[in-house]
């Protein structure tokens, strides 16, 4: 019998905490589900989302953020890429605003049901996600 281990996003974020430092952007932060895990490891924490909500510091389109080049030491984006229309542009944008030597931590679904929020456009394999970011930066 073949068994597949599913790793949930919280476990991935826990693992990623070793890379979180400095000025940190939570891109597509929504309800900031992981803020309590992320923020203690940062110098500053900024949450950005397309929808205004408590705790969201910047409201805007993650395809073209208002930040200058090399603004963040860490960029975190969890379960957002499947909802954007052009994930390749988001990946390019992440590289643009990440500082040299910084870290980009991304999670994206592969096997998950349709969940429009407001759209549900893509699924990513490990190889596909790696290719997306390799080509972007």
Question: Where do the PLM segments sit?
Answer:
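Active-site rim elements
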Residues: 1-3, 116-119
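Class I SAM-dependent methyltransferase Rossmann-like catalytic core
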Residues: 1-18
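Conserved phosphate-coordination/catalytic loops
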Residues: 3-7, 85, 123
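Conserved SAM-binding loop
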Residues: 15-118, 125-130
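Substrate-binding/catalytic lobe of Class I Rossmann-like enzymes that use SAM or dcSAM, i.e.
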Residues: 131-137
């Amino acid at each position: 019998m073949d068994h597949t281990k599913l790793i949930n996003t919280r476990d991935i974020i826990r693992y990623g905490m070793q890379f979180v430092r400095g000025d940190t952007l939570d891109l597509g932060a929504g309800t900031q589900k992981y803020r309590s895990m992320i923020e203690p490891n940062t110098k500053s924490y900024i949450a950005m989302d397309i929808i205004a909500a408590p705790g969201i510091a910047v409201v805007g389109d993650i395809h073209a953020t208002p930040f200058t080049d090399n603004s963040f030491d860490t960029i975190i984006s969890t379960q957002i890429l499947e909802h954007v229309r052009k994930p390749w542009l988001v990946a390019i944008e992440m590289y643009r605003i990440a500082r040299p030597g910084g870290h980009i931590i991304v999670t994206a679904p592969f096997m998950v049901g349709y969940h429009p929020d407001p759209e549900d456009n893509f699924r990513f394999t490990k190889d596909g996600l790696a290719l997306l970011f390799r080509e972007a930066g």
